[in-house]
Amino acid sequence: MQKPVKRSLKERRQQVLTVLTHMLHSERGMERMTTARIAAEVGVSEAALYRYYPSKTKMFEALIDNLEAHLFTRITQSVKNETHTAARVHNIMQMVLDFARKNPGLTRILTGHALMFEEPQLQARVAQFFDRLELQFINILQMRKLREGKGFDYEERVIAAHLVNLCEGHFMRYVRSNFRHSTQQSFEQQWRLLERLFA
């Protein structure tokens, strides 16, 4: 009889995050996540779960860190591959919305729905993610004058805030519709309105 494969601490931690993500996407994803529920889904005792993560807050922080690292790695690569400002902004927005569509459980974290019963520091951590996204847009918009010799009719910070608000609005609608209304739905039509900012 084969012995069960012993997983490393890193593999176990990743398993916990994968299970938690699936739970957030499930029908019970809006319910409070308890360590007992998470441990049961992972197939370990609560005591064992705490060996992988000292608290539930740390699990959520790890999820946010992972999604942020993944998205901003892709955003950095996209910016390197494209020099035109409008195309850069379009590609980033499309990437962010596509990420949300493919990761509904994580989108519940970004909207704050999954964090309603959790530590306030997690809401602050999500706010940092959106602040970083806004700063990325500001930098790209401000570079337009140097790259293309053109400015905007509005302050770059105002435009960047609007772009982030649009992303957040798509996330909220996606979660509110129980993931039926895709984040990508009607984006290209909405982009045609935004495109006028770059004329």
Swiss-Prot record:
It is found in: Cytoplasm, Nucleoid. One of its GO terms (biological process) is cell division. GO terms for cellular component: bacterial nucleoid; cytoplasm. Keywords: Cell cycle, Cell division, Cytoplasm, DNA-binding. Residues 11-71 form the HTH tetR-type domain. PANTHER family: ACREF/ENVCD OPERON REPRESSOR-RELATED, ACREF_ENVCD OPERON REPRESSOR-RELATED. Belongs to the nucleoid occlusion factor SlmA family. Homodimer. Interacts with FtsZ. Required for nucleoid occlusion (NO) phenomenon, which prevents Z-ring formation and cell division over the nucleoid. Acts as a DNA-associated cell division inhibitor that binds simultaneously chromosomal DNA and FtsZ, and disrupts the assembly of FtsZ polymers. SlmA-DNA-binding sequences (SBS) are dispersed on non-Ter regions of the chromosome, preventing FtsZ polymerization at these regions. This is Nucleoid occlusion factor SlmA. It comes from Pasteurella multocida (strain Pm70).
